[in-house]
Amino acid sequence: TFLEQGWTHCPLVEATITGSEEPEKFVLLHGHIDSWHVGIGDNATGNAAMLEIARILWENRADLKRTVRIAWWPGHSTGRYAGSTWYADTFAIDIAENCIAHINCDSPGCRWATSYHDVSTMTEAVAMLGKAIADVTGQQFQPERPLRAGDISFNNLGVTTFLMLSSTMPEELRQEKGYY
């Protein structure tokens, strides 16, 4: 193993799909592009999901009322959320005035992650998110207050957030497998 220390420039990839009625207003969908080691679950699954969401939204862009920004943060694992923190600092006024929600896409669809007992969301999104999870999975979810982690760098700007944590392994299965 080789450990490189020091400052480095990391690209922050962002796709913007402009809405037709209120293009200045936007939803920010984000995940992280860096990872420790292979990173299939954390966060190749999220990156693949965001690419597919971008493709579908682009195909249906004429129907979008508001803009969607999709960002892939560098420095999540290796910089303790440096990319999203930089973005929040750099675009704070725009985010505070125009971002209507931000959705984290970190490690969705991982193997055995079939439980929704620890879903991070702000209070104002509980009803909408609960309905979406029930409609898709048939499960009730247990909302939890978002932690100060996982690229949730926008809380101090007053933006609604959800899915810092989404599906996870059922507790019994984690114990059976000896996972923390």
Tell where the protein language model's regions lie, with residue ranges:
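Soluble metallo-hydrolase cores and metallopeptidase-like ectodomains found primarily
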Residues: 1-41, 51-67
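Short glycine-centered, acidic/aromatic-flanked micro-motifs in structured strand/loop junctions
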Residues: 31, 72-74
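Short amphipathic alpha-helical face segments that pack within enzyme cores
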Residues: 44-52, 82, 86
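Hydrophobic, well-ordered secondary-structure elements that form the walls
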Residues: 50, 70, 154
